Amino acid sequence: MEQQLNLGHLLTAARLLDIGALDISSLDLGALTSTSSSPGSSSPAMFDLSNESELRSLFCGKLKVDKKQSSCASNASTSSQPYCSSPPARKSSKHSRTAHNELEKTRRANLRGCLETLKMLVPCVSDATRNTTLALLTRARDHIIELQDSNAAQMKKLNDLRDEQDELVAELAQLQADEEVAQATSQACQTLSQSRPESRASSFTSTSSRDSPCYLEYSPSSKPMDSHKPTIIDLYAEGLIPRGPITFPRPLVYPHNVFDLMNLPPTPFDVSQFLPINLQV
């Protein structure tokens, strides 16, 4: 009886696998068990409905295995992470590794081309042993820093030149305005001088007389008639000033010392020798 029950379980499970697309809840397990019994058996059914839970567990396990295999087959074409023991999964993993290798080759080729371009842009060094990727990137970084500093210095110089240009433009505008004012003033002066030349000449004479010294001379036309008339006296003719230098009588022999001067004989003092030559009394 137990062997017949096990055989009935196997047959029922095979039928359930054939109709796996159906839902378990919609299955009539009683009908399946009744149809699974052979016509020559002594009992009408091989097992009763108490084995329904066991059949449900077997069928759910089979469905889980089928879903797992289908998910592995679908994901193997997009990524190489999941691994399935079925042959389609292994084939998809090989394709994914090949695609990954091709992508890696392309990436390395692009990186090599970028390094060659960078080597042409960055100034080279004399030491050939330092031409590594790290050394190239270091030199490129230093070169970029130098370019940034140079650009900052050039921008500062440009700003200074712009400020100086603005100052020069403002100074030029001020000079032009001053020149216009000077021209307008000169034109106004010329207009006034043409309208009143006599007044300008008199004002110029008064101004020049104030600025420069003036020597007054006797002029009968410029003096009133009742003023005292000055007289011109010739000092030389009148004998008030001698025509030659005043000299005193000197001794014939110069003394050598004070004692010789004291021992000189007395001479008569003549006052007329000290008077002017042309003195008239």
From Swiss-Prot:
Keywords: Coiled coil, DNA-binding, Nucleus, Transcription, Transcription regulation, Ubl conjugation. Residues 95-147 form the bHLH domain. GO terms for biological process: determination of adult lifespan; regulation of cell differentiation; regulation of transcription by RNA polymerase II. SMART domains: HLH. This is Mad-like protein 1. Expressed in intestinal cells in adults. Expressed in D-type motor neuron cell bodies. Residues 109-147 are annotated as: Helix-loop-helix motif. Transcriptional regulator which binds to the E box motif 5'-CACGTG-3', when in a heterodimeric complex with mxl-1. Involved in the control of lifespan in response to dietary restriction, the decline in protein homeostasis associated with normal aging, germline signaling and may overlap with the insulin-like signaling pathway. Plays a role in autophagy. Involved in promoting infection by the microsporidian pathogen N.parisii, possibly together with transcription factors pha-4 and zip-10. It comes from Caenorhabditis elegans. GO terms for molecular function: DNA-binding transcription factor activity, RNA polymerase II-specific; protein heterodimerization activity; RNA polymerase II cis-regulatory region sequence-specific DNA binding. Pfam families: HLH. GO terms for cellular component: nucleus; transcription regulator complex. Residues 95-108 are annotated as: Basic motif.
